[in-house]
Amino acid sequence: MSENMIMGVMRDAISTGLLVSAPILISAIVVGLLISILQATTQIQEQTLTFVPKLITVALVGLFTGNWMLHNLVGLTNRIFELIANIVK
């Protein structure tokens, strides 16, 4: 197994991980920022006010993008297993 193959697998794994986690992270950041702005303007400092909307948003985004995430992760796993099978031969 050459260095190029290892680097390719690692690059695919990192890019897939970033791609799969991006929708949930971005939605949580946006909702957290909006709630923080709302809290700053109204001077409400309740900690659960930021937690509950982020939790609901992450659950909904996970529900709507879960199939796509699973498809990407299974594709990466299949590529890695095919690479392992080619190395063993």
Curated annotation (Swiss-Prot):
The chain crosses the membrane at residues 18-38, 55-75. One of its GO terms (biological process) is protein secretion. It comes from the Bacteria. It is a multi-pass membrane protein. It is found in: Cell membrane; Bacterial flagellum basal body. Signal peptide: none annotated. This is Flagellar biosynthetic protein FliQ. It comes from Clostridium tetani (strain Massachusetts / E88). The gene is fliQ.
